[in-house]
Amino acid sequence: LVIELVDARIPISSRNPDIDELGKNKARLVLLNKADLAEDKWNDAWAEYFKAKGYSVVKVNSKKGGGIKSIQGVIREACKEKIERDRKRGILNRPVRAMVVGIPNVGKATFINALAGKACAKTGNKPGVTKGKQWIRLNKQVELLDTPGILWPKFEDQAVGLRLAFIGSMKDEILNTEELAAELIKFLGTYYPDVLPEKYAVEPDEDPYVVLHQIAKNRNCVVKG
């Protein structure tokens, strides 16, 4: 089984295209993680999209445990054909082995820890925390392979790279964070115009740097010089 975590805010942009080749001929479970940060109507729409492709789908909030209780049952259901084949061969109670994959900072380790009910995998609010593969035994029925998050070498669409930067899947060291903040302000102003005034008490402006300065001033982040 391949368990693929995607960010519910950008489900397509947060999918490594190489995973489809990796998961060929294997049962697939897509987790719309951080579903609490996306709108319900879009979570439902994307769940239907992946189901139409033949994947099992669960909307989860790994940090708060939302949707986690249903996962082990979904895993067993997704692997029922293999479990039945094993049973006919006289192999009983063999644990399901599942690979957990996804891009950096999508929440794989947080998901594994939530599912296990204890800290099994190292977590952090930045990309690249998991450095190597490790098997984690949840119980007698399920074993998970935690894998490092990997981005693909080249983005065909520049907008994909921008979205990944917005959600923290790229290291700040390789980004111009001021330009990135301005791009995010432009995006929010276009598609979610109420967010910035509600969150940061700022007035809309066509120049994103004016808004950025307002936010910095309101948060006492402006230095003299």
Regions found by a protein language model. Give the residues of each.
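Conserved active-site beta-strand-loop modules that form the wall/rim of enzyme catalytic pockets
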Residues: S62, I112, V142-L145
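Helix-rich effector regions associated with P-loop NTPase G domains
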Residues: L1, A8-R28, K41, S56, ...
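Glycine-rich phosphate-binding P-loop
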Residues: R97-G117, A121, T147
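Residue-level signature of catalytic and energy-coupling elements of molecular machines
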Residues: D7, F50, F111, D146-T147
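Canonical P-loop GTPase G-domain recognition
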Residues: A27-L29, A35-G102, C120
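Anionic group-transfer/hydrolysis microenvironments
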Residues: V6-R9, A35, L115, P148
